[in-house]
Each structure stands twice: as C-alpha cells, then as structure tokens.
C-alpha cells in the first residue's frame, strides 16, 4: 500500500479494519487516497469494514493544507475529484462501513466519516467542516451529506461558522450514531461490527439503499421502491433462509 499509510487487517471472520497511519494528523493527501483504494481492494471479501486511526488525537484532519497552498486551481480540482472518488466508492461499497472516530475529524476527515454507513465517536472526538475559514467550501461531499444527517439548519451552523462540534453534541444531533468513552471508538466499532455480521448483508444493503432513496423520492415512489427491494431479497433466497432458520431455531446461513 502507498507508503503504508493505510493498513488493512482482518479482525474477525468477515470483519476488516483499515487503519489510517500518516503522521502528524492523517492529512488526506494522495498517499491516503491511494491507500484507501488499495485497502478496499484487499477488503473485497469482508462484510463489515471499520475505518480507524492510529494517530493519537486525530481521526483525519482533512486536506494537506501546506501542499494545497502551492497548487493551481486545476490541480486543486483534480485533487478534489480524487478525494470524492474514494469517498463515493466507500459510500457505495457492497458492505457495511463504520468510522471509528477518536480525536479530530475535520474537513475531509469528517467527509470520510460521513461516507461510512455508521459512525462511532468517542467522548474525545470533535467534528467540523472549517473550509470557510480558508475561503473554500467543503468539496468532497460535505455540503450534501451533512444536511442529510443533521438537517439543513444544523448543517449550515456547522459549515458557516467552521466551528468544532464536541462528541456529545454530535451524538445528540445525529452526526454520530454511538457515543463511547474516550479511547474506545475502535473497540466499540468492532463490537458493533460483531452485531452486524450476524444479519443478511444483502438485506442490510437494501435497507441503506431504501433509506437513502427516502431523501430523493416522493413518498409513494419510496413505498414502491421498498416493495421492489423486498421482492428482490425474497427471490434471491435470503428471505427464505432467514425464515427457515427462524422456524428451525438455528442461526441463519446467509450468502
């Protein structure tokens, strides 16, 4: 992997961890972008992937500002396209992804966390999109994903001020899904992964698709899409296995 700044390991059957390890703050430059692509390639067989950090005090601190200050507009746009590309790949992955956030998740770091299916944040975590303080806007999905998680008003508050949101407030507004003691985000994310691994991954992915569609489709179309997803699961055999396992009082053997 690129400069070994993203390390993938198997934590348990079907569960992988991709650890960011680019001192001092996991700046999301090309090494981490390329490293994430490589890690996702290696995690192709996993059902759940946890994104974590080994850098104390940081999940990821966004773009490499020192480097970005030296490039022209074309190069800056190309960098943004590459960052959005890996985050969009993460968001569309055929698995459940969990961001385990201890410390700061700022700018692209928060955008990385928001691209995951779920977010576990520790009490020491802080979140922010401070791009307006640099004369920019969040450009790797932040303006689109944050309102979906916390609503328009809260999203504007966070983005227009560029302030850092403490973990307790982030949990209350829905920016993170589970709040855990400081230093335990990765452990808690792996425990959550253990809960998730027992269910049908195709059904879980269908839930994500259907919930995401709720933001874009009129209600009646959303209902129809829900029925379509359920029918596909029934025809695929996932539902048949789940129902049979329930009646036979045994763990399901999902594909």
Please annotate each region the language model reported:
Residues 12-22, 31-71, 89-100, 122-126:
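A structural preference for short, pocket-lining loop segments at secondary-structure junctions
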Residues 62, 80, 84, 107, ...:
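Glycine-rich phosphate-binding loop at the start of an alpha helix
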Residues 70-81:
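A short acidic, glycine-rich active-site loop
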Residues 86, 90-92, 100, 106-160, ...:
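CoA-thioester-processing core
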Residues 118, 157, 161-163, 169, ...:
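Well-ordered beta-strand positions
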